[in-house]
Amino acid sequence: MAKSITEVLGIKYPIIQGGMAWISDAKLAAAVSNAGGAGIISCGGRTTEYVREEIRKAKQLTDKPFGVNVMLMAPNKDEIVDVICEEKPAFVTLGAGNPVPYFAKLKEAGIKVIPVVPNVKLAKRVAAAGADAMVAEGMEAGGHIGVLTTMALMTQVIPEIKDIPVVMAGGFGDGRGLAAAMLMGAGGVQMGTRFLVAEECSVHENMKQKLIEAVDTDTIVTGLTLGGAVRGIKNKFSTEFVQKENEGKTSKEELIRMATGTNKLAAVEGDVVNGMMQAGQSLTVLQKVEPVATIIEDIMKQARETLSAAATIKL
């Protein structure tokens, strides 16, 4: 079995905080890292100046390893990678594009490379190219998603990847999920939605409240007709957007125009009616706003209890 992500990154617990555009900043990342996980700063929609400033800020807030998430569909991705190489966070996660061309530059800077993969083919490709670990993300996740479920990925990717940790993502929000992934041979889990209701999370209070009120069936997937599916909470915007997609009367260009800026509208400005509240399916665990340290302690306690109970199972 491959190493755990705790060994690769030098962290206490096998939990990575997902990169969430307009949300995952230095404050949240540092809080997660200080609590024993691996925090991530998101570059989604951000300038190079912002990325540099947040990395430096995180270094002042924690002496523990943290990372940066780069969406490879961003127009300024090359400049952002250059900044990351200069500022040297512990690791980088790379998604929404081909990560392999960036491996050499990042590794030469001493930065661990962790691509996000949606299928077995890409998982094998990035492993062969020298990834230090990978995140296999199922469609239960919030934000941009693939077409395979987390269980389908877990049972097919993990047996193929022998030498590096496979961190599972998509629908994980508690210790039972973490325990299940570890029993399946995962090197850890990545959670994004779970940290949206953390005290240290900068997402607008209106969105936090909607997440706490949400039930398990309250997500919807937009963008299926555009080749870029995005999961979020059902509201006026997301339901009307999907309706327009299904009717087939609205052009692709118009749909893209409608969607542009809606993530920021919800997460930063707090418009939970007309904005896209990106979140995954692990919603019922979002009961209240509490510190990151409490969230992680509760996850680990439940994971240990679940693993202990699993030891008594007879087949």
Language model features: what each stretch is:
Residues 116, 170-171:
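Conserved acidic functional residues
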Residues 1-161, 165:
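Active-site entrance/lid segments in N-terminal catalytic domains of soluble metabolic enzymes
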